[in-house]
UniProtKB/Swiss-Prot annotation:
Annotated TM spans: none
Job description of the protein: O-methyltransferase that catalyzes the 2 O-methylation steps in the ubiquinone biosynthetic pathway.
Keyword line: Methyltransferase, S-adenosyl-L-methionine, Transferase, Ubiquinone biosynthesis
Enzyme Commission code(s) on record: 2.1.1.222, 2.1.1.64
Species this protein is from: Salmonella arizonae (strain ATCC BAA-731 / CDC346-86 / RSK2980)
InterPro entries linked to this entry: SAM-dependent_MTases_sf, UbiG_MeTrfase
Pathway(s) per entry: Cofactor biosynthesis; ubiquinone biosynthesis
GO biological process: methylation
Record-listed S-adenosyl-L-methionine binding positions: 44, 64, 85, 129
Reactions this protein catalyses: a 3-demethylubiquinol + S-adenosyl-L-methionine = a ubiquinol + S-adenosyl-L-homocysteine + H(+); a 3-(all-trans-polyprenyl)benzene-1,2-diol + S-adenosyl-L-methionine = a 2-methoxy-6-(all-trans-polyprenyl)phenol + S-adenosyl-L-homocysteine + H(+)
Cytoplasm is among the record's keywords: no
GO molecular function, a single term: 3-demethylubiquinol 3-O-methyltransferase activity
Protein name as catalogued: Ubiquinone biosynthesis O-methyltransferase
Amino acid sequence: MNAEKAPERHNVDHEEIAKFEAVASRWWDLEGEFKPLHRINPLRLGYIAERSGGLFGKKVLDVGCGGGILAESMAREGATVTGLDMGFEPLQVARLHALESGIEVEYVQETVEEHAAKHAQQYDVVTCMEMLEHVPDPQSVVHACAQLVKPGGEVFFSTLNRNGKSWLMAVVGAEYILRMVPKGTHDVKKFIKPAELLSWVDETILKEQHITGLHYNPITNTFKLGPGVDVNYMLHTRAKKA
C-alpha cells in the first residue's frame, strides 16, 4: 500500500481528497486558501466548547480534521484530541504544525467507519466539520460518529444547506466572485438539507440539541453565528445515556 495515497476504502472520494492534497502545504497560511477556516474557527471552537460544558480533560475526536486547525485549538483548551482524515498530505502538515507549536494531537489516516469499529463509545466529544459534503455516503459518517461517542456525549456536525441561496453564496460568491476558497471546492449536489441530516441523526442514539447558522457579511467582512440555516449551519447532538 502506498502511504501517500488514500487506500481503497469504503466511503472515500479520491477526487475530493486530491483537492485538499494539492493545497495542503498552505493549510496554516492565514491569508491562503484556508483563510475562511481560520476566520471561523474561533466561532466553531466557542460553540463546541460552550455546548459541551468545556473541553478541558475530555477525549475528543475530530473527523475530517484536515491540517488540524480545529483539532489543535481544542487541544489548546485542554482536550485529548485525535484527528482523523484520509488525506496523507494534510495529516503530514497537521503533525508538523502540532510539533512546531508544542501541541499534542494524535493524527490517524483512516475512515471514521474503520475507527468506529475499533473505538466504539470512547469519546466524550466528536466533531465533524465541513466533511459530510465531501464523502459519497454522509449518512454512514453520521452513524459512525454516533457509535464513537460515549453515552451522554456530544456530537457536532457542520455542513452546507442545499438550495439556490447556498449555491449563490458558497459557490458563485465564495469561489468565483470573492475567491475566498479555490474554485471547485464545493459541489452543490452534495450539500445537505437540515431535514436530511436530522433524519440520519434520528436513526442513531443521537438527539438534536441545538442548530445554528454560520453567516458571512461581505460588506463588513465578518462571520457570526445566529438564526437561519439557509447556507452554512452547525448541529449539536447528544447521545442518549445508557
